[in-house]
Each structure stands twice: as structure tokens, then as C-alpha cells.
Amino acid sequence: AYEALDVLYPFNRYSEQAQLELIYCYYQDGDSPSAKVAAERFIHLYPNSVHSDYAYYMQAVSDMDQDRGWYLRYIPIDLSLRYPGTMRLGYHEFAELINRYPNSRYAPDARQRMVYLRNLFASYELHIADYYFRRKAYVAAANRANEIIHHYQGAPEVQKALVIMIK
């Protein structure tokens, strides 16, 4: 229905709200790629909208959730064991939201999600460093640990990375 409204009346006064509802509907339906595309479209069509912060937020959330897949709702899997993929893009989009709209109502949640993602990325890198260490590839393990220390300051895995470098 929202798509039809947009096709028939692309620039009427309800079009902007229909685009926002479409983003939400796609996301709630579990279609993160379509939610992201709809959010990007909204940002392109309405760059000065008072609701642009919501579109940036949903764009980032969609990227964060895109790698999870439907099966992770039913099977508990440690996400730090999987390649982060579009979660990295989501992290940068949360940062863009905070830079553009620091006083947005979505900024506090974006900051929390960035901390979660930073810790997830650090944990992923730590798993790789540990793998290299167990394989006796000490230089590769030290390089990964060094990357954790330099790129993920504040993450709990920094201390574990230091231990790998000391060994």
C-alpha cells in the first residue's frame, strides 16, 4: 500500500510519512536489505527532513542486523566467531548519525550500539589472534593483537590481546 501511494502520488504531503513507514515495515518484516534501501532513498529524497535522523538510524540498524540471518533468532551462535561483514558498515553509519545529529533521540542508542559493535569486532579479531597463536604463527598472532590494541581501545579484549603479545 505504501509503495502504491508513492508510485501514484510521489510528491504529495503524505509521501514523506509513507517512506518512513515503509522503512519500518521492511525492518519489522525482517527484510533488512529492503529497509536499508528505503532508508537510503528517504535520505536522498528528503535530506533536510526533520526525520532524517530516523532514516540514518534505520539504515545503520539494518546493516547491523543484515548479517545475522533468520536462523540466529532460533539458534544461539556467538557472533564474534563470524565475519562482521555489513556490521562494520553499520558501525560507520551509527558514527555518521552521531556526527550529523548529536542531539537526536536516536544518538544515545547509536552510541550504545557502537560500543557493542566495537567489542564484537575486537572479540572477532581476538579469536583470529588466538587461532594464529595456537597454530604457532606468532608473528601473525602478534599483528592481530596489535590491531586490537590500536583500533579497539576500551574493549575488554584489549587486555587479552596484550597477553597474546607478551606470550
Q: Could you describe each region identified by the protein language model?
A:
Residues 1-167:
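Acidic, polar-rich low-complexity tracts and alpha-helical solenoid repeat scaffolds
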